[in-house]
From Swiss-Prot:
Signal sequence bounds: 1-25
Gene: PMEI5
One MF term in the entry's GO annotations: pectinesterase inhibitor activity
Lineage: Eukaryota, Viridiplantae, Streptophyta, Embryophyta, Tracheophyta
Protein name as annotated: Pectinesterase inhibitor 5
Protein family (similarity comment): Belongs to the PMEI family.
Gene3D superfamilies given in the database record: Invertase/pectin methylesterase inhibitor family protein (1.20.140.40)
Length: 179
């Protein structure tokens, strides 16, 4: 009898662990609907809609945390890219611009990390503020390539635009959470 009870409890616990997150997951149609409210639907569907963590997301707070994580991943990838391309920019303007981007991506990384931590605490206004600061640092990295000297093509435009678009998604989710 005791063995049957233990087996039954293990089965129910396993069932709860496996089924509970899925049963309470945010429906995929809600993610599609959210993405349709963004300025770049295919981008949103690519980065949020296909994220393997989305099926386990219970609510918009979890989706917000995933979007912040996606931003942090883009920032980290850009930082790695900076290290790879830095030697291609040996002129004074290129070196200065790469250093501005390296510094700004350091700021963005720290801000998105803290935003994620505050998102866990549901401190949404602080999340919004930090996501803006991180995004503005990335935007400045894009803009520095057009300031103070000859215009150059930024080697980080891909990452800069991804962070900018993810920021729009973060702000959209933020607005839904606070209104």
């Amino acid at each position: 009898m005791a063995t049957m009870l233990i087996n039954h409890m293990l089965f129910l616990t396993s069932l709860l662990i496996v089924v509970f997150p899925v049963a309470n997951a945010i429906p995929a149609r809600d993610i599609d609907k959210l993405c349709k409210e963004t300025t770049d639907v295919p981008f949103c569907l690519k980065y949020l809609g296909t994220d393997p963590r989305i099926p386990a997301a219970r609510d918009l707070t979890d989706v917000l945390l995933i979007a912040i994580t996606q931003s942090k991943m883009q920032v980290d990838d850009a930082t790695t890219h900076i290290d790879r391309v830095r030697r291609k920019f040996n002129g004074p303007h290129g070196r200065r611009r790469i250093e501005v981007c390296k510094t700004n991506y350091g700021i963005a990384s720290a801000r998105f990390h803290t935003a994620w931590e505050l998102g866990l605490q549901k401190s949404f206004w602080d999340v919004e503020k930090l996501a803006r600061i991180g995004t503005n640092a990335v935007i400045d990295c894009e803009n520095v390539w057009r300031r103070d000297g000859p215009i150059q093509t930024s080697p980080l435009t891909f990452y800069n635009m991804n962070v900018f678009k993810l920021s729009g998604i973060i702000l959209l989710i933020f607005n839904k959470l606070v209104t």
